[in-house]
Amino acid sequence: MPISRYYDVKRDEKGERYLEPYVTGFLLLRLPLLNKGTAFTEEERRLLGLEGLLPPHVHTLEEQKERVYRRYRLIQSPLEKHIYLRHLQDRNEVLFYALVVDHLEEMLPILYTPTVGEAVREFSHIYRYPRGFTASTKNIDRIDEALQNVPLEDVRLIVATNRDLGQEAA
């Protein structure tokens, strides 16, 4: 069974895991888990229907990390840095996590406490992309219907919260 309606996890001949997309073209570029931005090789661009949808130059992940980190360093406000990183995550999760791993000590206070409290308070002003599944007392009577809208087929982890910090954004 595929892990998602949009991709599955496969292994190559060396046993290395990779994502095999079931979508191509414009839709592929809109899925943060699959979008590699300018890191798609020329062959991948042809096979995945990305010709003409990306700038022609292929950049490595290292080049992408250097570019976004330079931009990140120009931002002064912790909240603006948080927003910048979340927007990156909404576009390209591979690049986001690679960058954060390289700069974890510097970025963790931006992505989590103390900055996340301010981000939650400003949530309605900075919300851009839905992440995960939300159930509340307002939709509990339609929970089965709502679960059908989740694009994942093989869910192995669920994080539940009492909304203690999140109540500020409600």
Give the ranges of each region predicted by the language model.
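Metallocofactor- and cofactor-centric catalytic cores in central/energy metabolism, strongly enriched
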Residues: 2-163, 167
